[in-house]
Amino acid sequence: MATELKTKNKIHPQKMYLYAGLGSIVMMFAGLTSAYIVKKSQSNWLDFELPKVFIISTVVILLSSFTIQMAVKKAKEGLQNPYRGFLSVTAILGVVFMLLQYKGFMMLQANNIALTGPKSNSAASFLFVITILHLLHVLGGVIAIFGVRFKSLSAKNNPENTLPVELLSTYWHFVDILWIYLFVFLHWIG
């Protein structure tokens, strides 16, 4: 009688760590957006319109979701050059997103909407804190993309191990979805 080994569909420990980290990020942004809603009801709240450049940055980050997914696909197919190319394009789109966000901040400041100082108000402070925290997470993702990209060039690289790009893709899609949520929240609720 042959012994049958039952294999369970287990989640890789690194994926569990990632999910736990993403959960904590969700809680942080849920707290910030909840505080935003509460604070908005106060009399000193100043409503203002988001710069149109935030719409462009939203399109850019959505495109980056496509390119990171293509990187995963090419990695699983064992096509290293296209894989590296899609990683590079994703990183470039991430940098473009950050630059567009910065441009949006400069447009806000040009319209006398500032984070600190005599021109500051609660609405602007919340906007800047929420978007800057998101930008830091995008920056972390861009750094991770470059790390995975350069590791793929290493002689020790195992092309069959797609876990790094899968983890990266999960994080990147999360950051993209988080921005969509924040953009919709700030645009329609803000």
Q: For the regions a protein language model found, what residue spans apply to each?
A:
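...captures the hydrophobic TM-helix bundle architecture rather than a specific catalytic motif
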Residues: 1-190
